[in-house]
Amino acid sequence: MGSVALILKVMPESPDVDLEALKAAMRAKVPSIQDIQEEPIGFGLKALKVMAVVSDQGGETDALEEALSSIEGVERAEIAELTLT
């Protein structure tokens, strides 16, 4: 089996969400995260771009999306980019 590298765009619930605490919660819940970067959206809101590498087995990317979406302070998480490694 191979691996899949993906970038997910994670939207916080509001500009008031503590992004550092959110990053720590994501890293604790999903150990496969390689990097997290902030991306300004507008009106003080910033999205988090999360880079992770997971197995290419069926359901792994969906499970990652669901894990990130379930974290308190996250409005939604969606795959922005995906490539085989």
Swiss-Prot record:
The keyword Phosphoprotein does not apply. Keywords: Elongation factor, Protein biosynthesis. One of its GO terms (molecular function) is translation elongation factor activity. Gene3D superfamilies: 3.30.70.60. Promotes the exchange of GDP for GTP in EF-1-alpha/GDP, thus allowing the regeneration of EF-1-alpha/GTP that could then be used to form the ternary complex EF-1-alpha/GTP/AAtRNA. Belongs to the EF-1-beta/EF-1-delta family. This is Elongation factor 1-beta. It comes from Methanosphaerula palustris (strain ATCC BAA-1556 / DSM 19958 / E1-9c).
